[in-house]
């Protein structure tokens, strides 16, 4: 456990950041799931619109360091391939 005022404060901040980041990751996953559900339903227009939102969300998370930039690129590539395969 934290033995100094500084360590206590850092522990508080770390927990606050952890909870914030978890919420951000969950929101990102939700945007990706919306795209995949639109693809499963066969609605290309909805999938394309949802992909724009998901792409922005993935890039944002990569920029902030919540996910690796390669993971963001890989996810965008795979989702886009699934949308293109619908045609």
Swiss-Prot record:
InterPro entries: Ribosomal_bS20, Ribosomal_bS20_sf. One of its GO terms (cellular component) is small ribosomal subunit. Disulfide bonds: none annotated. Residues 9-20 have a biased composition (Basic residues). Belongs to the bacterial ribosomal protein bS20 family. One of its GO terms (molecular function) is structural constituent of ribosome. Residues 1-27 are annotated as: Disordered. This is Small ribosomal subunit protein bS20. The gene is rpsT. Keywords: Ribonucleoprotein, Ribosomal protein, RNA-binding, rRNA-binding.
């Amino acid at each position: 456990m934290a033995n100094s005022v500084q360590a206590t404060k850092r522990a508080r901040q770390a927990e606050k950041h952890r909870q914030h980041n978890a919420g951000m990751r969950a929101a990102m996953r939700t945007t990706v799931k919306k795209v995949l559900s639109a693809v499963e339903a066969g609605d290309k227009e909805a999938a394309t619109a949802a992909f724009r939102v998901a792409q922005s969300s993935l890039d944002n998370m990569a920029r902030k360091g919540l996910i690796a930039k390669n993971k963001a690129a890989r996810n965008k590539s795979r989702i886009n391939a699934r949308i293109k395969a619908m045609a």
